Amino acid sequence: MVVLVEASPRGGAGDHPASCELDAGGDVGSGGRQYAAVVVGGTFDRLHQGHHLFLKAAAEFARERIVIGICDGPMLAKKQASRMYAYLIQPIEKRMENVKEYIKAMIASYHFQSIKPDLEVHVEPIVDPFGPSIVDEALEAIIVSKETLPGGLAVNRKRAERGLAQLEIEVVELVPEKSTGNKISSTAFRKKEAERELHKQQQEAPHEQAVELECRI
């Protein structure tokens, strides 16, 4: 049975530096390479197929423990200042719960027997760029995408400064969206939600104006 260890929202640090948006997943499979403890990080907003594949690939690299950091606090503030629709990012509690539920379902499924049933899973918020990735001596690898590879390199530089062993960096390929050829993106989902809300408001506006006119008459 998977052991899920949850840190309280806004009460922990994080794992994945530089870029916290793991918006797409990858070609699943560790190629037989495994590490006692691995770390991954991301926003994990509106958990989608890309996230699923990325988490599965990361879990396959883990022999005993996987730490999953989810962006919150100052990390989200940076995203909201630089990206459209970032204000629609789900609350940290919702994103943490979605990740936990997916991990539990994944390990319980017979399709995912390559993942150890007793894998220890830590789910915690990220409130700074590095968090436990530069203090946890037991970590052996960090799982990244091509986009977040610079973050993995930054972690190793910080670990070197602190006299800690370097982490192996495993890069998971991104999965393109079939319809567009682009990567699967949480930002795209937020954009669609914003457009639906705008369309709804535009449809309701004439009705509200008519009601106001009737009241005046």
UniProtKB/Swiss-Prot annotation:
It is an enzyme of class 2 (transferase). InterPro entries: Cyt_trans-like (IPR004821), Rossmann-like_a/b/a_fold (IPR014729). One of its GO terms (molecular function) is dephospho-CoA kinase activity. Its EC number is 2.7.7.3. Inhibited by CoA. Keywords: ATP-binding, Coenzyme A biosynthesis, Nucleotide-binding, Nucleotidyltransferase, Transferase. Pathway: Cofactor biosynthesis; coenzyme A biosynthesis; CoA from (R)-pantothenate: step 4/5. This is Phosphopantetheine adenylyltransferase 2. The lineage of its organism: Eukaryota, Viridiplantae, Streptophyta, Embryophyta, Tracheophyta.
